[in-house]
UniProtKB/Swiss-Prot annotation:
Pfam family, one: FolB
Disulfide bonds: none
Name of this protein: Dihydroneopterin aldolase
Residue numbers annotated as active site: K99
Protein backbone atom coordinates (compact mmCIF):
# COMPACT_ATOMS: atom_id res chain seq x y z
CA UNK A 1 0.00 0.00 0.00
CA UNK A 2 1.14 3.50 -0.80
CA UNK A 3 1.78 5.95 2.05
CA UNK A 4 1.55 9.65 2.75
CA UNK A 5 3.80 10.59 5.67
CA UNK A 6 3.78 13.64 7.93
CA UNK A 7 6.66 13.45 10.39
CA UNK A 8 7.54 15.67 13.33
CA UNK A 9 4.44 17.88 13.29
CA UNK A 10 4.69 20.17 16.32
CA UNK A 11 1.61 21.52 18.07
CA UNK A 12 0.94 23.20 21.41
CA UNK A 13 -1.88 21.65 23.39
CA UNK A 14 -3.33 20.97 26.81
CA UNK A 15 -3.60 17.18 26.98
CA UNK A 16 -2.55 15.00 29.87
CA UNK A 17 -3.48 13.38 33.15
CA UNK A 18 -1.55 15.91 35.23
CA UNK A 19 -3.11 19.25 36.16
CA UNK A 20 0.04 21.07 34.99
CA UNK A 21 -0.39 19.61 31.51
CA UNK A 22 -4.00 20.74 31.37
CA UNK A 23 -3.26 24.31 32.51
CA UNK A 24 0.26 25.10 31.26
CA UNK A 25 0.20 22.98 28.12
CA UNK A 26 3.17 21.64 26.18
CA UNK A 27 4.48 20.74 22.74
CA UNK A 28 3.14 17.56 21.16
CA UNK A 29 5.00 15.81 18.35
CA UNK A 30 2.73 13.99 15.91
CA UNK A 31 3.80 11.55 13.21
CA UNK A 32 1.26 10.27 10.70
CA UNK A 33 1.41 7.50 8.14
CA UNK A 34 -1.65 7.39 5.88
CA UNK A 35 -2.32 4.38 3.67
CA UNK A 36 -3.75 5.72 0.43
CA UNK A 37 -3.87 4.36 -3.11
CA UNK A 38 -1.60 6.82 -4.95
CA UNK A 39 -1.75 5.09 -8.35
CA UNK A 40 -3.90 7.77 -9.99
CA UNK A 41 -1.88 10.64 -8.51
CA UNK A 42 1.39 9.04 -9.60
CA UNK A 43 0.13 9.01 -13.19
CA UNK A 44 -1.76 12.31 -13.33
CA UNK A 45 0.30 14.45 -10.93
CA UNK A 46 -2.98 16.13 -9.97
CA UNK A 47 -3.81 17.15 -6.41
CA UNK A 48 -7.39 16.02 -6.93
CA UNK A 49 -6.14 12.42 -7.23
CA UNK A 50 -4.57 12.29 -3.77
CA UNK A 51 -5.03 13.37 -0.17
CA UNK A 52 -3.73 16.92 0.33
CA UNK A 53 -1.24 16.64 3.20
CA UNK A 54 -1.54 20.37 3.91
CA UNK A 55 -5.23 19.85 4.64
CA UNK A 56 -4.38 16.81 6.78
CA UNK A 57 -1.92 18.94 8.78
CA UNK A 58 -4.53 21.67 9.30
CA UNK A 59 -7.12 19.12 10.41
CA UNK A 60 -4.77 17.58 12.96
CA UNK A 61 -3.64 21.01 14.19
CA UNK A 62 -7.24 22.10 14.82
CA UNK A 63 -7.84 18.98 16.90
CA UNK A 64 -4.57 19.01 18.88
CA UNK A 65 -4.66 22.75 19.56
CA UNK A 66 -8.42 23.15 19.89
CA UNK A 67 -9.52 20.21 22.05
CA UNK A 68 -8.44 18.76 25.41
CA UNK A 69 -7.92 15.08 26.19
CA UNK A 70 -6.84 13.53 29.47
CA UNK A 71 -5.01 10.77 27.60
CA UNK A 72 -3.07 11.16 24.38
CA UNK A 73 -4.53 7.76 23.48
CA UNK A 74 -7.89 9.51 23.18
CA UNK A 75 -6.33 12.29 21.13
CA UNK A 76 -4.79 9.75 18.75
CA UNK A 77 -8.12 7.96 18.37
CA UNK A 78 -9.88 11.26 17.66
CA UNK A 79 -7.25 12.13 15.03
CA UNK A 80 -7.90 8.83 13.25
CA UNK A 81 -11.67 9.26 13.39
CA UNK A 82 -11.50 12.83 12.10
CA UNK A 83 -9.13 11.97 9.23
CA UNK A 84 -11.26 8.99 8.16
CA UNK A 85 -14.32 11.27 8.13
CA UNK A 86 -12.66 14.12 6.23
CA UNK A 87 -10.59 12.12 3.74
CA UNK A 88 -12.42 9.06 2.32
CA UNK A 89 -9.41 7.78 0.29
CA UNK A 90 -7.47 7.05 3.51
CA UNK A 91 -7.63 3.30 4.09
CA UNK A 92 -5.49 3.04 7.23
CA UNK A 93 -3.73 5.38 9.64
CA UNK A 94 -0.75 5.02 11.93
CA UNK A 95 -0.41 7.90 14.39
CA UNK A 96 2.31 8.45 16.99
CA UNK A 97 2.08 11.20 19.59
CA UNK A 98 5.02 12.13 21.81
CA UNK A 99 5.58 14.51 24.70
CA UNK A 100 9.17 15.67 25.14
CA UNK A 101 8.70 17.24 28.57
CA UNK A 102 5.84 15.74 30.56
CA UNK A 103 5.84 16.57 34.28
CA UNK A 104 7.43 13.32 35.43
CA UNK A 105 10.83 12.89 37.03
CA UNK A 106 13.45 11.08 34.99
CA UNK A 107 15.71 11.25 31.99
CA UNK A 108 14.22 10.39 28.61
CA UNK A 109 13.99 11.78 25.11
CA UNK A 110 10.19 11.57 24.94
CA UNK A 111 7.18 9.55 26.06
CA UNK A 112 4.23 8.71 23.88
CA UNK A 113 1.90 6.30 22.20
CA UNK A 114 1.40 4.86 18.74
CA UNK A 115 -1.74 3.35 17.33
CA UNK A 116 -2.99 2.02 14.02
CA UNK A 117 -6.53 2.02 12.69
CA UNK A 118 -8.15 0.72 9.51
CA UNK A 119 -11.52 1.46 7.95
Amino acid sequence: MDKIVLEGCRFYGYHGAYKEEQTLGQIFLVDLELSVDLQAASLSSQLTDTVHYGMVFDSVRQLVEGEKFILIDGLAGAICEQLFNEFPPIEAIKVAIKKENPPIAGHYKAVGIELERQR
